[in-house]
Amino acid sequence: MLITAPLLIACGADSTHPAPYVQPLNNRLANYTVNTPLRMAHFLAQILMESDRMRTAEEYASGAAYEGRRDLGNTQPGDGVRFKGRGLIQITGRANYAALVKAFGLDYIAHPTWLEQPDDAVHSALLYWDSRKLNGWAEKDNVLAISQIINLGNIPRPGSKRQIPNGLSARKALLAKCKTALGVGAAVPVT
């Protein structure tokens, strides 16, 4: 299925921002086997949520909250701000930026703002999606698991302090819009 700006708007993208992402999405989705309407619906819903409906490829917050977060690889002073969320899925932390350097051969450590460019923003989101095997969860229509992996970094163990990802109800609403726009049946997502 071809991605168009009207399709992205029907999925919930802000009407003034999706055009720069259309060609990168069309160029790259199939390479990461985001190639069924259900997989596409889940992927698009998550990137719409993470990018404030394609209004930004840079996290609004300063990134100071990530300072010293060794779980993100932020081991040097200033890493939190330098490696705040970028791209359509908000890649966060020195370790995740370093993984992109290794995968793409582009120096995102020296040039973190490159992830704000449309092709890099899309490509980084797809690599993250693929590396976390999110197509499998999409095939199970499990919006909760996908949202936990993207927003919390993993599926929390029972009894963990934080179980519910930020904006879960908004993620579900975006998924419903994406399913409608892509013609996916009325399957009820796992919550």
List the predicted regions and their residue ranges:
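Amphipathic, Lys/Arg- and hydrophobic-enriched alpha-helical face
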Residues: 24-30
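Peptidoglycan-targeting cell-wall enzymes and recognition modules
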Residues: 2-20, 24, 43-128
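A generic secondary-structure signal for well-formed alpha-helical elements
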Residues: 50-54, 95, 132-133, 154, ...
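Acidic helix/loop microenvironments that form the catalytic cleft of cell-wall polysaccharide enzymes
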Residues: 47-50, 138-163
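Low-complexity, Gly/Ser/Thr/Pro-rich intrinsically disordered linker/tail segments
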Residues: 153, 157-191
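Surface-exposed patches in mature extracellular/periplasmic domains of secreted proteins
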Residues: 31-43, 56-60, 135-147, 190
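Non-transmembrane alpha-helical segments in soluble domains
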Residues: 26, 44-47, 125-126, 147, ...
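Extended serine/threonine-enriched, polar tracts that run as long, contiguous segments within proteins
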Residues: 130-135, 150
